[in-house]
Amino acid sequence: MITAENYFSLENSMAYMGAGQYKAFCECEAGALAEVTGNYERETTVSMLVGSYVDAHFEKTLDLFKAKHPEIFTQKGELRSEYKRAEYIIERLERDSMFMKYMSGEKQVIKIGEIDGVPFKIKIDSYHAGKVIVDLKVMRDFEPIWKDGLKIPFVEAWGYDIGGAIYQAVEGNNLPFLISAATKESEPDLSILSVPQDRLDFCLNQVKENVHRFADIKRGLIEPIRCERCDYCKSTKILTEIVDYRLIA
């Protein structure tokens, strides 16, 4: 049985695919496999912790988060400036009745299911049973992002639409998927964003096309491809040839 305590365990990470894990495999198969098997741990940045601080508040697990992350405090026991900013973001969000309405669902609901025969697990931030799935996201800003030479909406750049497709498929009732979004700007912006069903359908088809390969990689049936760009690939890189500098982009 998957619980909040063992949701991210190595055992469950091997047994189930998740939205974050799927996206990690899309970025770098070798790095994702190393994480799943416990051979590599991605660095936790201050920016990530600020987002996690806001998440923990709405999950009602902030005290536990603070206990697990003493680095967010100064030697005097005060919150560091970045987390005071997180407190301000929280205060701003709680002033908005519409934002809070969508964040008022059942918190951190764990569900398991299958996508094209591959086991998946999800954890929903705010679940309104029979009505809507809501995912909380805190980011730098709402501006489009350059990716692979194209300027695309941040929802697509960060794969939030892919996560929504996975959540909807595993939940199983074809519920609308919304993003409760907030920014880390000096004056936080906020929005409730919908992801159209045709986009979710497109993303789900992509998941179905890729997920069997990723599952086979986890089972050791296929050798993972290295991206040679991520921190994992840099940390395990072995030089085998001299490279013309003009080929380095």
Question: Can you say where each PLM-predicted feature lies in the sequence?
Answer:
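Mg2+/Mn2+-dependent nuclease catalytic core
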Residues: S104-G105, V109-N205
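Metal-dependent nuclease catalytic cores that hydrolyze phosphodiester bonds in DNA/RNA
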Residues: M1-I124, I225-D231, V243, L247
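Metal-dependent nuclease catalytic regions and adjoining charged, substrate-binding loops involved
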Residues: Y83, I90, F154-E156, I166-A249
